[in-house]
Curated annotation (Swiss-Prot):
Catalytic activity reported: tRNA(Arg) + L-arginine + ATP = L-arginyl-tRNA(Arg) + AMP + diphosphate
GO biological process, one term: arginyl-tRNA aminoacylation
Gene from which the chain derives: argS
Motif interval(s): 'HIGH' region: 123-133
InterPro entries membership: aa-tRNA-synth_I_CS, Arg-tRNA-ligase, Arg-tRNA-synth_N, Arg-tRNA-synth_N_sf, ArgRS_core, DALR_anticod-bd, Rossmann-like_a/b/a_fold, tRNAsynth_Ia_anticodon-bd
Full protein name: Arginine--tRNA ligase
GO cellular component: cytoplasm
Any one GO molecular function term: arginine-tRNA ligase activity
CDD domains (alphabetical): Anticodon_Ia_Arg, ArgRS_core
Keywords of this entry: Aminoacyl-tRNA synthetase, ATP-binding, Cytoplasm, Ligase, Nucleotide-binding, Protein biosynthesis
Subunit structure: Monomer.
EC id: 6.1.1.19
Amino acid sequence: MIDFKEKLVDLISQEINDLNVEEIEHLIEIPPQPEMGDYALPCFKFAGIFKKAPNIIAEEIASKIEGNSYFSKVVNTGPYVNFFINKEIFAETVLEEILQKGKYYGARNIGKGKNVIVEFSSPNIAKPFHIGHIRTTVIGHALRNIYNFLGYNAIAINHLGDYGTQFGKLIVALNKWGDKDKIKSNPIPEFLKLYIKFHEEAEKNPELEEKARSWFNRLENKDEEAMDLWKWIRNMSLKEFKRVYDMLGIDFDSYAGESFYSDMMPDVIEEMEEKGLLQESQGAKIVDLEEYNMPPAMIEKSDGSTLYITRDIAAAIYRKKTYNFYKNIYVVGSQQKLHFDQWFKIIELMGHEWARDCIHVPFGMVSLEDGTMSTRKGRVVFLEDVLNKAIEKTKETIEDKNPDLENKEEVAKIVGIGAVIFQELYNSRIKDYVFSWDRTLSFEGETGPYVQYTYVRTKSVLNKSNYKFKKLDDYSLLTDEDAFNVIKLISQFPDTIIKASERYEPSIITRHITELAKAFNKYYHDNQILVDDQKVREARLFLVYAVNTVLKTGLSLLGIKTPEKM
């Protein structure tokens, strides 16, 4: 595909020798209004070079470049040179690339097979898989898809919270109040009841906390009874989690959680000792990070048990040895920023240069309309309940609007779950938000169902046409303003994917395909597609095909399926 910006940089650099290509590229802007052109060059910086007023320089540059085949019009407006793309060449370039690449339009082999680890979701064993987990789960899954699409080998790791003092608490609760048959039929809610009961009883009887610590130490020492109970709790939980992952269409390359790294702790602590990083503090081992404006990081408690941070360090070292990663990405809430800052710095101080390749991708907090979620108090919204409610609500809408639709159950699942994922990926990941049933399940505005419906509309037109796509004889039929706006958004899709990968921000893609859906629906409203004139019909169908391709790819990258009918 012709890169019009690159062509523009070449043209400008022929006229201005004092700046290099990169400097010129950084100067080029996109005008705020379409009527001002497709690109703009501000000439303020050239005043010192040419010893002339910027508006005179702009006028001279415009007169020299005018008449180029790639740009139909070049004009100066005050100190700016505005460039208007040749719409016919532009349409031909973009649409023929779509024809050539199909569903791989936008894919590039930037990664050349390099390994990128994306750690995401990572729920705690025996605790609810709640609405708060949706963000890490869908952001991580989208990033994995994006990196694979760009030629990396993305490895999805679910770093399960399957280790720690909470297992001591749960084992105590299980032994005192648990009913294994009840747990088997409904694991997570039953584990939650036990967890809540433990905390309620421990407030009255502090000895329970001591018993919990004792059980966790037995677990760390590989005591057979403790290990058997732990494995049973883990397996029951994982079975539940996988059911939700299946609903979301997500799988993982590894479920290696915290426990996987427990045997590696002594070597990690020994390496820190050898590097002179550890200090004693009240019987515990810490790394002093005051020099880096951070509080000390505790590596080992006074009773000899390890912490989350120790296991994260061990996991990173293991991953580097095993996968030789290019990037090691952690999709974890923004409240964990200090934790990651600390252990990234410790890895660096241990002499591992690859510490800079470990990246924390933070996201904002989710809270309920009446306050923050708390597992200890049992105030949670289960993610599975949210997904099922979304499916049910979608089914009601289908029954109301299209009762004769085939495969209603399947369509309701695709659209309902897609609505939840789309909602999570529409706004910038760093923003906190309050979870609202009404907003999440709304089927109006900038939503997943709107984009999915636009895709179905394009699919329906294409099915009716039976048209076999080939190069057009006349691309001037797609140079009107509405068609040009659609084609421009299609042309920006490949760079949108790259931008999303560089910023670890799937919402860039979500918003882009929403804008494409809007632009296409305006075009569709004003232009009949299946007209009698064969050439016009073929041109418009080609545009429909291009939109169909990009919407399907965009939704797929976000982890959202596309129904064939709605």
